[in-house]
Amino acid sequence: MYYSSGNYEAFARPKKPEGVDRKSAYIVGSGLAALTAACYLVRDGQMKGERIHILEKGPTAGGACDGWKFENVGYVMRGGREMDNHFEVMWDLFRSIPSIETEGVSVLDEYYWLNKADPNYSLCRATVNRGQDAHTDGKFDISDKGAMEIMKLFFTPNEELQDKKITDYFDDEVLSSNFWLYWRTMFAFENWHSALEMKLYIQRFIHHIGGLPDFTALRFTKYNQYESMILPMVKYLEKAGVQFHFGVKVVNVEFDIKPEKKVAKTIIVEENGKKDKIDLTENDLVFITNGGCVENSSMGSQNTKAEYNTEIKEGGGWDMWRKIAKQDPSFGHPDKFCSSPEETNWMSATIETLDPRILPYIKNICKRDPLSGKVVTGGIVTVKDSSWLLSWTINRQPQFRSQPKDHCLVWVYALFSDKEGDYVKKPMREC
């Protein structure tokens, strides 16, 4: 293994790989990771764009990084990303992706200048009693015993955490603390989720701890992340000649498996109801998005509930991964992630304010003008006494370029979609 330190090698451009002009790439999915792979193949791999194929079952790129206005429904953002200084791969890439708003600058330039001029921080992290400040006051409110429970998990070998739950390591010393309120709502953790996942998150985001209570560690984009991140990447790839194949489901990837190596040989696809196959050679690279956090998502509206459908459908990432995993156990165990929807589902909604009388109530909580064009809530505001454990956030407005100037978009999400509401007396998933 070769190691380097410092930034000596960070800015040196790689030589053109030998034989790259004979190689092709097939990328399954078009989310942030898939588009990143394509961008690196173009920039660093110097592969010809027309030899890069992105296979996407939906009509647009972006995966979970979406932002769209649907006719008769309105603006929809299923989720959002919270970025920080240590997204090294992302910042390395976006320094090379041109802005689609400002000529001559990169996406990273825009992002850096925005967050330097308008730094992110929250003035109200949680509420109780219908909008009153819960006065978490930047405190973790955790005992020495609770801190030791977190430390114990942090230092437990991964092998010992297989099939263990968070509640196997944390008791009320942690689970009733402000720390857990901050953490679980920021990262969408349930008490019964994987202890190993919890440990890996702590390791990955340990530098967040100081900025956890007020979100000072976070950075956000100007618009929704489809317009701010995905669209510039798509434009960059299209200009390079990368081939986008929308409406193409990848049903399976078949491997030639030998003791010493495993090689993808065939991609089984479906387009317009017809199945076909792509035969692969030693000059073909395959990048697979296996599973996905919005794979089985459904959409409702003001008058129609989102369908709660737990079926794993053919042509989706989870079903494809199952078929790949059946070929060899080293390809993992997808059912660990997708077989318990009651324990893993959550719900989000995008709310557009049409009545200006709502805005003063929002301002009273977040202590900022929602239509100022600057940071508003600075991250989620958690309704601490909500049966749904509901949180909401307002990023810089407008969130869409097409958004009316006097309208505000609020993103809402909750962890307990099966619980009866405090005001609306039915489960969130029935709303």
Q: What residues fall within each predicted segment?
A:
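Extreme N-terminal leader/targeting segments of oxidoreductases
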Residues: 1-25, 43-51, 69
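Short, solvent-exposed loop/turn and secondary-structure capping segments
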Residues: 64-67, 197, 297-302
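C-terminal segments that line or cap access tunnels to active or ligand-binding sites in enzymes
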Residues: 208-219, 283-285, 290-431
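Glycine-rich Rossmann-fold phosphate-binding loop(s) that bind the pyrophosphate
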Residues: 29-32
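Rossmann-like flavin
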Residues: 100-207, 219-220
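Conserved N-terminal glycine-rich FAD pyrophosphate-binding loop of Rossmann-like flavoproteins
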Residues: 58-82
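Helical element adjacent to the flavin cofactor pocket in flavoenzyme catalytic cores
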Residues: 203-285, 290-291, 303-304, 309-318
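Elongated alpha-helical scaffolds
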Residues: 81-96, 122-123
